């Protein structure tokens, strides 16, 4: 979606070091055991500013992206443990004044946490049951420059950890809070940009066909995983050089549901579902982040809530093909994480 020249555009680079102060909250009564947990952490970001005129024209902003590494004490060392997080982030930024910048920051990555659920040694932790889990975060950032190359930031960020339904129990851990840090730029950034020409946006809707695969357990205490296969037809419409809108029709064959039906002695053996969803995404070079909200139009069993949400990160291999990872959830509980292959039809 973005020109490949984005990868070689003139860049300003820098790093930041920050502290995180957050508080976990219980989404349901069954997650009340985390009440009072206050995860605290340290964070290192390495980033680039995409400040070429072409990218500014496309975004109508200053686009920033990078790698984030974090350490968190999750607030209950004997129950929730500690976590190491590695994520990619992107952040459209906007100048408010000579010294003041705001941005909207989205993270996607992975977390290693050391106190997973164990029926013998740690039965009380229902938030995650595998050491490696998914990490998602969304926040609003503000920056104030104290000199031409240095800025302090205060941000509000919503953090989420979940193993994506690969193993149960998996209530997930949500911990919103504040991030306070110091940012240093190797060269003085120039936020006094202007849009010299309106980028040409292709009016056509890109049409994709996607196949995906996952595997999950049938219940909270099973270790055997059952395959989930799916097919998705989607349309993508550019809003500008960074933002795009999506609409999709998805069909699923869920063998984990079929196994659950057998366990519950339900006579109707139907493992198929179909849903429609729409959402919005960000593009940065060959990497796309997208989130969508959907509803099942065919789900005869009704084991899950009718409404679901999805969060996808994908990488464009070439003009036609892309690969990605997608997290699907019902309300606060992840259903599964799938791997997917996408093909551009037009």
State each model region's role.
Residues 53-56, 98-102, 144-152, 188-191, ...:
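Repeated loop/turn-to-beta-strand initiation elements of outer-membrane beta-barrel proteins
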Residues 13, 36-42, 61, 80-86, ...:
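Residues that define the transmembrane beta-barrel architecture of outer-membrane proteins
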Residues 13-19, 63-67, 102-106, 152-156, ...:
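Transmembrane beta-strands of outer-membrane beta-barrel proteins
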Residues 1-18, 100, 144, 150, ...:
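Bacterial Sec-dependent N-terminal signal peptides
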